[in-house]
Amino acid sequence: EKIFKTKIKTKDNEAFSSFLKDLKLYMLQHHPKIDIDYRIVEKTKNEEDMELRQTLIIESIIKQFFNFPYQNETQASIPREKLWINYEEKSKSNPKYPSDWVLRKEFAWKRDNRCCNRCGSTININEAYTNFVKEINDGGGYNFENIMTLCINCNKIVNSKNPNITISSLDLNDKLISFIK
């Protein structure tokens, strides 16, 4: 019986090590701007139920992802020679998006190296969400310095009114849960 228990324990340890390695690698590659604290691994080391332990670790990562401090800061500008004739005129605050909005969104996305400004995940133009440093309702304009590029998860977080609902709706939940073996 003792040998059998040792074999199971070794197999569990290998599976857990693989889970943790995959999780850390995923977060580093897909959300490089989010600094994750993995102390939860040590805190849960005596947990016998491996799936519960993995779930607790994932919950900790999701909470850290949600609570990661993000400041709406003025963004980098685009070189003047790349701007078009009526750029300044269409940058003024207006409740309606300017007719050149698609171009502005693409320029901001390229300026941000095709990445989410908050977490650093690589996104394609169709997945990119935009937010404003200073909201249009508050007098912000459509100039590049006011446009932020975000992924779907960070857009939900930045615009969150109810943290619990937002956390449960993040795509990141499903992705991380898929690492449980």
Where would I find each of the regions flagged by the language model?
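Short, charged surface segments at domain edges that flank catalytic/cofactor-binding sites
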Residues: 67-118, 145, 168, 174-180
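Generic detector of leucine side chains in alpha-helical contexts
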Residues: 20-28, 52, 56, 83, ...
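Histidine-centered nuclease catalytic patch
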Residues: 92, 96-99, 120-150, 160-174
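Mixed-charge, low-complexity interaction segments
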Residues: 1-77
